[in-house]
């Protein structure tokens, strides 16, 4: 086979502050994951890699070991390094088109049990769907915090009722990338993304009203709907294209059947779906025709693997009736709880609810995020994070294909943080969850994402944690736990 040669002048990925050996490995990793290098291709020798990148033999060797640990290359005695064979991709889960009648959310304790273990130290992968700590810009945020504290000590005690004007300006400036034009005064800052969703629901619906939402859906949305005394109507969703517009059309033909629709169109949690542009247009048009508002969460929209950021539903909103919600909690600063919403024509009601029910938030943290956005740090961070998540998603998908038993299906997200896995029908994901918890393997059972029983043989994993030999070992063990149920 012809030996693979790399362009010496090609940019090394990932960029510093990663160790040099990871930067050297990054070029090979990119060539492998994009398909330029295929299973069985011979790779440059250690000596050649040293010459190509001007590094020491120990650095080149560490680069190959790092790639070996990720399952991307293999060493053959007396022959050198080769691209490792890739496992056959698993098929995608299929759309379950069944619809349940609208009903009050009745928690069965499983979600509460999941939340109790969500902060369990040492779990790998972790239970929480967010970027791993080593991928977060903690050092930069600490530096900005110290700098802003010196310049503006008053921020530690001063509170702006509508939130930081600087942050609202930065959010408005960046909104154009998602296809929507916003004025800073149209933006309301919140204590995280879920508070934004909570305020939005209270602004457009009341106890007893029916809320249409994707099925499966993020379990905290079900918890919020339950806390407000509302009913949920689960609309079937496809793991690739998201909410079924046809099913929503059918469900809303009776006037007043649905008071609002809640949707995560870009890289939905738990399935990772990305709604096509035409479906986004159809959804907004259908909501306008039937007279119900749409509450949109775009918390994962910046985590795209492709070149283009997908537009938000609100970019198609001529009636100003889409309430756009987002936050910086998944990819920048989980502990800051900085979120925001653009409520459109519901702004006054959302402001009233916010002012009556919660604090404006910590202005210092809002100012830190604002400066992070303004000085280019956010863009640099997101480029690195997206590259890392794309690699981690592929590594996890390969491991699942390698270690899980036959009969499994796997979503193929084009961004976000979540993988949705369909197990053989006879597997009970609750039992998988219970055993995995005992062994510190962070897995979410499908039943937490629905009020029905249709996802009892599904699980959600996330790929926010950097790929390590320990993570691969835990996934291999998870595959064994699943296989044990098959006998």
Task: Give the ranges of each region predicted by the language model.
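N-terminal basic, amphipathic alpha-helical segments
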Residues: 1-147, 327, 351, 355-362, ...
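Short glycine/serine/threonine/alanine-rich loop segments
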Residues: 55, 72, 230, 292, ...
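Short beta-strand "wing" residues that participate in macromolecule-binding interfaces
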Residues: 74-75, 182, 443
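Conserved core of the PLP fold type I
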Residues: 150-290, 295, 301-317, 389, ...
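Conserved core segment of the aminotransferase class I/II
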Residues: 318-387
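Conserved PLP-dependent catalytic core of the aminotransferase class-I/II
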Residues: 382-408
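AMP-binding (ANL) adenylation modules
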Residues: 449-453
């Amino acid at each position: 086979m012809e030996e693979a040669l790399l362009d010496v002048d090609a940019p090394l990925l990932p960029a510093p502050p990663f160790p040099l050996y990871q930067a050297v490995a990054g070029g090979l990793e990119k060539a492998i994951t994009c398909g330029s290098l295929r299973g069985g291709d011979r790779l440059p020798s250690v000596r050649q890699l040293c010459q190509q990148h001007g590094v020491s033999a120990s650095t080149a060797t560490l680069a190959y070991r790092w790639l070996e640990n990720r399952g991307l290359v293999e060493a053959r005695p007396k022959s050198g390094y080769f691209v490792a064979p890739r496992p056959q991709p698993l098929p995608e889960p299929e759309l379950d088109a069944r619809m349940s009648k609208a009903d009050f959310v009745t928690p069965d304790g499983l979600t509460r049990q999941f939340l109790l273990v969500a902060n369990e130290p040492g779990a790998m992968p972790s239970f929480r769907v967010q970027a791993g700590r080593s991928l977060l810009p903690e050092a930069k945020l600490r530096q900005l915090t110290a700098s802003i504290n010196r310049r503006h000590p008053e921020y530690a005690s001063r509170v702006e009722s509508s939130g930081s004007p600087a942050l609202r300006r930065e959010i408005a400036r960046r909104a154009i990338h998602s296809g929507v034009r916003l004025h800073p005064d149209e933006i309301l800052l919140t204590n995280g993304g879920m508070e934004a969703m909570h305020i939005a629901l209270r602004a457009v619906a009341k106890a007893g009203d029916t809320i249409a939402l994707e099925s499966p859906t993020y379990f905290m949305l079900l918890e919020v709907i339950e806390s407000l005394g509302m009913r949920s109507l689960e609309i079937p969703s496809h793991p690739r294209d998201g909410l079924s517009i046809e099913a929503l059309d059918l469900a809303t033909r009776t006037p007043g059947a649905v008071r609002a629709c809640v949707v995560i169109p870009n890289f939905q949690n738990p399935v990772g779906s990305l709604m096509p542009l035409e479906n986004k247009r159809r959804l907004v048009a259908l909501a306008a025709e039937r007279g119900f508002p749409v509450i949109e969460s775009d918390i994962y929209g910046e985590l795209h693997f492709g070149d283009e950021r997908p537009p938000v539903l609100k970019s198609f909103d001529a009636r100003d009736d889409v309430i756009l919600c987002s936050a910086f909690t998944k990819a920048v600063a989980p502990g800051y709880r900085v979120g925001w919403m653009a409520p459109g024509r519901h702004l006054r009601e959302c402001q009233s609810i916010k002012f009556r029910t919660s604090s404006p938030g910590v202005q210092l943290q809002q100012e830190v995020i604002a400066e992070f956005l303004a000085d280019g740090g956010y863009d640099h961070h997101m480029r690195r994070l997206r590259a890392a998540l794309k690699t981690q998603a592929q590594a996890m998908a390969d491991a699942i294909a390698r270690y899980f038993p036959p009969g499994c299906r796997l979503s193929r997200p084009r961004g976000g943080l979540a993988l949705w896995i369909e197990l053989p029908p006879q597997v009970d994901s609750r039992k998988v969850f219970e055993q995995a918890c005992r062994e510190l393997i962070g897995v979410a059972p499908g039943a937490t994402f629905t009020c029905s029983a249709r996802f009892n043989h599904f699980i959600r994993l996330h790929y926010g944690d950097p790929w390590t030999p320990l993570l691969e070992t835990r996934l291999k063990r998870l595959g064994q736990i699943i296989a044990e149920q098959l006998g």
